[in-house]
């Protein structure tokens, strides 16, 4: 079984996130989504639009998502969450490149394939 993991704030979730999730699901047999926690959201934006439990429930309800968790990380990365899940693939959206992400170090260490550029940047949650 090929396990795929993706991550995001989904704060708020928008059509670009749906495309990202749908494309990620096509990469493997099971898709696990890491939802960045409220602490990470505050680090990035100063505050959350929606709290982590609401964002998690919305993500879990999406048909292509097999499982979703709240990130266990305390910084702006999902490195510890990736280490916990141990996916075969870690995928990023169209606005991220694998050379730019801090998660590339843990993925390389664990032999996890990184795929970037899933979908186009259709929207940005920071516009809301």
Summary of predicted features, one role per range:
Residues 1-128:
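Nucleotidyltransferase catalytic core that binds NTPs
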């Amino acid at each position: 079984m090929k396990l795929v993991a993706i991550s995001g704030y989904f704060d708020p979730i928008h059509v670009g996130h749906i495309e990202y999730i749908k494309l990620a699901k096509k990469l493997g047999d099971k898709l696990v989504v890491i939802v960045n926690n409220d602490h990470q959201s505050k680090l990035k934006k100063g505050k959350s639009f929606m709290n982590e439990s609401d964002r998690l429930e919305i993500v879990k309800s999406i048909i292509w998502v097999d499982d979703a968790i709240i990130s266990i990380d305390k910084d702006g990365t999902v490195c510890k969450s990736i280490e916990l899940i141990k996916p075969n693939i870690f995928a990023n959206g169209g606005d991220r490149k694998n050379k730019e992400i801090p998660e590339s170090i843990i993925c390389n260490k664990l032999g996890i394939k990184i795929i970037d550029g899933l979908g186009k940047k259709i929207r940005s949650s920071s516009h809301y």
